[in-house]
């Protein structure tokens, strides 16, 4: 039994917070469980304090100091617990102590009351403090707490690694690790060395798991890179295959284009072989070389003489024309003689199916016209001056006619339009000598000439050189000859104009006297589908009233605007690159290009427009723009607008194209003209076979009802009046002026005053 002096000492030891050794002292003193008052004080302070019930008076102090960290660890581990949980824990421990005390008292032998009480106190202390199972449980709790803290620290330090570790660590592996750790806890003595060893093992495992995770991530990255490289290779292969396909498509397109060109060349060769040409000369200013042409069998008008002493600045150019062009004959030949004449030509040339000839039974002189067409570059035998711009500008169907009796008749149907001027010895009412016929052998030689492509190319080049020479030598008489015949000198408003016109007239008269003066008639192109040779007359004439300005008032050209200034050079470039392109297509190209240009690019042309307008205003202060009146056309007795007439002719041309494409063979007989007017004979040539398209020319195929473009001005009784001939506008403004305004109103025609006496073109 405990003595009274011992009680204060025991309470004093119980109140101390220093943990004691679990092993009891030799004197048998027992450390009691902390009192309820102590627990309440700790709860009020909210400081968790959990003391192991250890014996106080153990003499070995190192043992007591050894377990100080353990008690501290338990305090820290129990830190998060609430005071209520601590209180319940203490009560449970007290109950366990009391339950363990009862069997111990019953098992003791009967002794003295003091000894029994003392033994019971020792048993209580041993049951509460000294059992190894209790120590093992406390150490297991400490180790679990350490593991939890380590895992929390790892989670805080590496939060992103947690999902990968949880994926790698399966539930079975976790259970195995926990079981292994709990099984080894029994052998732990609770020393810091053992705890450090466990910590090292845990860190080793963590390092292994981290390295495994890094390896898996590296393998995953490698797989990603490999997949990306494979995708890139596939993309490159697809691009390569696409490029190869595009290249193959381009090669196929080139092959198709080459095949198309070959087909076109074959068609041209076939046309040249099937339709051998007759050669007609384009007469130079003198006829020195015409004798050589006559010796070769070319058909020449009889009114020309060979002058041996004259110089020949221009070599004669023999130009073939198309089968669709007309052949001229003399009035001395009747219809039967004309049929025999053409039959002889066809027999000599061995014309293939599809060949057509047009005839004119009345005229001053005759000439034969050949089938295939080459560019005509010079169409006069007299030296009427031709302006530089008129020579440089190719003639096309969209050009308005401009006339002058001093100029040669040139058809406004692109640069390969031949024309023929014929001399009348005694006037339009007198008969003249029939045209000479060439021998069949000469026709055969001309066939060989045209079939030779090199010879044709050479002829074209020589013709272009002749153009340049004409432009250089005849630049001085630019565009003013047309005024000579349309305006009387007495009607001039100023003395300056009168003097200029007199000088021009004198120059023209001198050259005409040197070369021989020619009068001109007008040809009516008539075609009939009859095969019996009957004269199918189909006339259509265009009349223009001279409204808006007086017939004797001179025409003043409008100043060019910015577009005209720019299009002047551009049109020439396009025509040099594509000489057979139709003017309407060129106008469309120029219009689209002009719209695509920026204002900065257009600025210099607007400045030029302002300069030209100012210059025009200074030169003509009283100028007032007066547009031409609208034209009408008489077709088979019906009065039609020009647009309606063009639509009719377009439909007829389309029908004729379809007719010839089918390959039907028909001979068009010679048609007689309904009316022969004194004046010029103009031959409208056919386009070159080098451009077998619908845009080459209006007259790309024979068409019925080709209209007579006729003016009623100046025909007085029986006096032979010199008619004005159709010719292209000069390039310096008239043709561009008409292009722009005809697009605005296709029925309104703009041009020179002399054109009031000529109706527009059939296109």
Curated annotation (Swiss-Prot):
- Name one process (GO BP) from the record: negative regulation of DNA-templated transcription
Coiled-coil stretches noted in the UniProt entry, renumbered to this chain: 195-268
Q: Where's it found, cell-wise? A: Nucleus
Q: Which residues carry this modification: Phosphothreonine?
A: 131, 372
In this chain, the stretch annotated as Disordered covers: 1-30, 77-138, 369-426, 714-763
UniProt cross-references to InterPro entries, sorted A to Z: HMG_box_dom (IPR009071), HMG_box_dom_sf (IPR036910), SOX/SOX-like_TF (IPR051356)
Quote any Pfam family the record assigns.
HMG_box
The terms under GO molecular function for this entry are: cis-regulatory region sequence-specific DNA binding; DNA-binding transcription factor activity; DNA-binding transcription factor activity, RNA polymerase II-specific; RNA polymerase II cis-regulatory region sequence-specific DNA binding; transcription cis-regulatory region binding
Q: Which residues bind DNA?
A: 556-624
**Superkingdom:** Eukaryota
| Claim: Coiled coil is one of the keywords in the record | yes
Residue list for modification Phosphoserine: 21, 370, 411, 414, 439
Which residues lie in Acidic residues bias regions? 727-752
Q: Which GO terms describe its cellular component?
A: nucleus; transcription regulator complex
UniProt biased composition (Basic and acidic residues): 716-726
Task: Tell me the CDD domains matching this sequence.
Answer: HMG-box_EGL13-like
- Write out the entry's keywords from A to Z: Activator, Coiled coil, Differentiation, DNA-binding, Nucleus, Phosphoprotein, Transcription, Transcription regulation
Alphabetical list of Gene3D superfamilies matching this protein: High mobility group box domain
Where is this chain primarily localised?
Answer: nucleus
Residue ranges with Polar residues bias: 102-111
Query: Assembly and interactions?
Result: Forms homodimers and heterodimers with SOX6.
Q: What does this protein do?
A: Transcription factor involved in chondrocytes differentiation and cartilage formation. Specifically binds the 5'-AACAAT-3' DNA motif present in enhancers and super-enhancers and promotes expression of genes important for chondrogenesis, including cartilage matrix protein-coding genes, such as COL2A1 and AGC1.
Protein name (Swiss-Prot/TrEMBL) = Transcription factor SOX-5
- Which species is this record about? Rattus norvegicus
